[in-house]
């Protein structure tokens, strides 16, 4: 047993050494731009016509077509997506690829870049307190609850942030500014929909996608505190989808087989577990690398018309390299749903505030 544990940790150490550390610098905005970004980011930076608002309110969140994205939602704001990459440097570009993939499908680039230095992704080595704090900042500024996409150890951090927001591991949390990349001296926000004060603890994320969280990365010291709670999803998220792969040594419990990879709700959160097609050793890191799909029309057609499944498999008739397409399609379906839900929620609240004034 000791030999097996030592061998596993040695393999992980070698992988981290060869792959490089996945920590990236979160560069704050230049001093001269801080005030401008502070004053312009969020609700004050956009307006929609009454006609477009009516079309958005008429959308069915469960069936958002490519035409809806390209026309009805074009130019509309979107919930910020916080992407958290794993612990190896090579996965950074793959999460950036996934960010570009969503942009190419029609999701606003501004909603995937942090306003400080323009980062598309943050490291799993950042504190979960920071992640929870920027969730609060984005919600207060934008009026839409953010989404989180976590890959590998990024999935651990996503769940840690949920535990913090649920009050399971903290009584108070600071708001964090992604413009300055530092905490603010407050633990409350003004709820943009009600105008009332609300502590950071108790806020919700709209959607989380957690890909390849578990496996041998559980033995890393920075994840020991999640050994027995990784699969427990608290009420601080509306919808949570866990993705796992067969033969995934790095991110799959029992090599990605069976219910040990399944997340479960501790309360009212909607939780799905999706088994992706079995791959090889490299599939764990390569799955999010999907911007190549943007130049494959048959693949895009399948992605845009995807019907959710707990074991999705793309048709073999689609040409080209398809690794990861099922992950991309399922996430895009959920992202579209929560984009519409959050935007409709914001529009209705603004109408209510006008009528109540």
Please describe what each predicted stretch is.
Residues 109, 127-253:
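Serine-dependent carboxylesterase/thioesterase catalytic core
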Residues 17-37:
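Bacterial Sec signal peptide processing site at the extreme N-terminus
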Residues 1-4:
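Positively charged n-region of N-terminal signal peptides that target proteins for export
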Residues 7-17:
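Bacterial N-terminal signal peptides
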Residues 220-357:
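C-terminal catalytic-base region of ester-bond hydrolases, centering on the histidine
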Residues 32-146, 316-321, 325-355:
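Active-site catalytic motif of lipid deacylating hydrolases and related acyltransferases
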Residues 95-99, 158, 254:
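Short, highly selective alpha-helical patches that border small-molecule cofactor pockets
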Residues 82, 113-115, 209, 239-243, ...:
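Hydrophobic/aromatic beta-strand patches that form the interior of the parallel beta-sheet core
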